[in-house]
């Protein structure tokens, strides 16, 4: 019974699915049918009727016939074929041949899409032709007005265009022929070709209008402004030469001749309507002329610099020479009391040598100024270099002078450090005396002797003449290490001795009960009396810890408490 129900349910499902799928396919057919009808109703005939209003000759006639044939084929052949395919699709559906129906629907959709594109293309081309005719008709009248205005301007102001006027005339006459060509193409129905003529004509007239606007200004530059500037430069050059300026290195006369020749080339470019080249050449000429002005101005400013700065630079050298002389005397004095490293002596000799070279160089520049055979710009460069070297030497001289002053300062600092270390050593000895130790261990006594000797060595170094500060600094560093180590060893030794003594006292309570403790403490006392406080502490701690673990911690606490009370 269950199997029967399952079969019935499956059958019902198949029937429902089949019904839904057929319904969906019929909706697809209806959509394609509507698309086909919409294409058939497109206003292509109306658009083609607009073309008939144009001159139906030449290119227009050929295009019209092609579009009409395309549309007739779409309506009479291609759309009926689509209708037949839709009918075949319905037949496949009625026979439940869904796969064939689905495949045919895809083919119909592709075909309608191609027809859609073809119809769009026809309408777009028609609109382009009609729009081209309308736009060309409007623009050609505007261009005629531009052409008339250009001819009037050329006639009225011909003198402002110079040699370019004849070629402008030729170009405007050639433009008239293009107007005639446009009329013939339009009359022959070749509207698209006529449109191309309009575009070319517009480009040509725009170019001529731009030229006619720019040529007068360019001619003014080349015929008036630039030659006037060259003449002004030539006059200025001659005046400066007469005033004593040396300008041979600028080659002004040759450069001015080159600029004059370049102006002639620019005029030729304008006459040939090579306006962009002419504009670039004029811009280059302006920049080059500005450069010439700058070069002459540079010489004037350099002359002012030389006249005003020479005395000041001479004063700088005189002042520096006086300072160097004082430093030389100071260095001689310092050498009697201090040892100067070879590098410092070499530095000072280098400063003296540079000083002589700078003075010699300044005298040479003075001679060249007096001879008046060198350009002021070159003299200025040399003076500026000289000032830079003077500034560098002043800095080196100041550093050397400060180094000499620092030597005395370093000596005072070294003596202060020696006093501090002596106090540190005295503090170590005071701690030893205060602790009332029975004696000093031999290693400690050796360290004490070493520390005293290191301080004596520093004192001896400080009394040497000349004083060698690097050697003093090395001796100070050695003494510092020795004294610091002695102080630390002193504190450690006193602490060990005090703890050893306290541990022995603490262990006395176990002497009678434990022979081993008695023996261990006796050994610790022996070591203590022989100044071996470190071993005495170790022996005492080991002895009391053997009978009372943690005893040394208690000893330390008692010892710390005693120290705090004393403080």
UniProtKB/Swiss-Prot annotation:
Major localisation: membrane
GO cellular component term of the entry, any: septin ring
GO BP: division septum assembly; septin ring assembly
Superkingdom of origin: Bacteria
Annotated TM spans: 3-21
Record's keyword annotation contains Cell cycle: yes
Key words of the record: Cell cycle, Cell division, Cell membrane, Coiled coil, Membrane, Septation, Transmembrane, Transmembrane helix
Database matches in InterPro entries: EzrA
This protein's record includes keyword Transmembrane helix: yes
Topology in the lipid bilayer: Single-pass membrane protein
Subcellular compartments: Cell membrane
Spans within the Cytoplasmic topological domain: 22-567
A Pfam family annotated for this UniProt entry: EzrA
Extracellular side: 1-2
Entry function: Negative regulator of FtsZ ring formation; modulates the frequency and position of FtsZ ring formation. Inhibits FtsZ ring formation at polar sites. Interacts either with FtsZ or with one of its binding partners to promote depolymerization.
Similarity-based family: Belongs to the EzrA family.
NCBIfam families membership: PRK04778.1-7
Protein's name according to its UniProt entry: Septation ring formation regulator EzrA
Organism (species): Geobacillus thermodenitrificans (strain NG80-2)
């Amino acid at each position: 019974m269950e199997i029967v129900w399952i079969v019935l349910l499956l059958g019902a499902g198949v029937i429902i699915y089949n019904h839904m799928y057929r319904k969906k396919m019929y909706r697809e057919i209806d959509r394609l049918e509507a698309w086909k009808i919409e294409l058939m109703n497109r206003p292509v005939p109306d658009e083609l009727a607009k073309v008939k209003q144009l001159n139906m000759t030449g290119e227009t006639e050929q295009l019209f016939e092609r579009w009409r044939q395309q549309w007739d084929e779409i309506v009479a052949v291609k759309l009926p074929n689509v209708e037949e395919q839709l009918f075949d699709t319905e037949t496949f559906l009625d026979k439940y041949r869904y796969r064939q129906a689905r495949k045919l629907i895809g083919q119909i959709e592709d075909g309608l899409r191609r027809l859609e594109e073809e119809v769009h293309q026809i309408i777009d081309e028609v609109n382009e032709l009609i729009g081209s005719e309308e736009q060309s008709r409007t623009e050609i009248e505007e261009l005629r007005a531009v052409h008339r205005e250009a001819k009037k301007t050329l006639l009225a102001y011909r003198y402002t265009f110079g040699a370019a006027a004849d070629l402008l005339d030729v170009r405007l006459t050639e433009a008239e022929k293009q107007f005639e060509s446009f009329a013939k193409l339009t009359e022959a129905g070749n509207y698209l070709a006529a449109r191309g003529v309009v575009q070319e004509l517009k480009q040509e007239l725009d170019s001529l209008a731009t030229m006619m606007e720019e040529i007068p200004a360019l001619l003014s530059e080349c015929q008036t402004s630039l030659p006037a500037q060259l003449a002004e430069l030539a006059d200025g050059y001659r005046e400066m030469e007469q005033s004593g300026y040396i300008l041979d290195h600028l080659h002004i006369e040759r450069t001015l001749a080159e600029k004059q020749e370049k102006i002639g080339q620019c005029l030729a470019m304008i006459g040939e309507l090579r306006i962009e080249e002419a504009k670039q050449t004029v811009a280059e000429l302006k920049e080059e002329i500005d450069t010439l002005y700058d070069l002459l101005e540079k010489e004037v400013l350099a002359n002012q610099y030389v006249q005003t700065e020479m005395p000041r630079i001479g004063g700088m050298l005189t002042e520096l020479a006086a300072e160097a002389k004082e430093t030389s005397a100071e260095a001689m004095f310092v050498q009697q009391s201090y040892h100067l490293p070879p590098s410092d002596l070499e530095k000072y000799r280098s400063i003296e040598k540079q000083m002589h070279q700078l003075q010699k160089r300044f005298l040479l520049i003075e001679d060249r100024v007096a001879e008046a055979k060198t350009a002021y710009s070159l003299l200025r460069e040399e003076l500026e270099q000289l000032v830079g070297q003077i500034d560098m030497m002043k800095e080196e001289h100041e550093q050397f002078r400060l180094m000499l002053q620092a030597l005395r300062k370093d000596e005072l600092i070294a003596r202060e450090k020696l006093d501090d270390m002596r106090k540190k050593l005295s503090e170590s000895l005071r701690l030893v005396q205060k602790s009332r130790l029975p004696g000093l261990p031999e290693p400690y006594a050796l360290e004490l002797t070493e520390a005293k000797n290191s301080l004596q060595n520093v004192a001896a170094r400080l009394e040497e003449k000349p004083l060698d500060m690097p050697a003093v600094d090395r001796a100070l560093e050695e003494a510092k290490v020795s004294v610091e180590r002695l102080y630390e060893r002193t504190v450690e030794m006193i602490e060990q001795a005090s703890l050893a003594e306290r541990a022995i006292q603490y262990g006395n309570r176990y002497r009678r009960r434990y022979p081993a403790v008695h023996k261990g403490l006796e050994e610790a006392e022996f070591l203590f009396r022989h100044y071996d406080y470190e071993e005495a502490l170790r022996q005492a701690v080991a002895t009391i810890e053997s009978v009372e673990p943690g005893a040394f911690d208690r000893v330390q606490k008692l010892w710390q408490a005693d120290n705090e009370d004393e403080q």
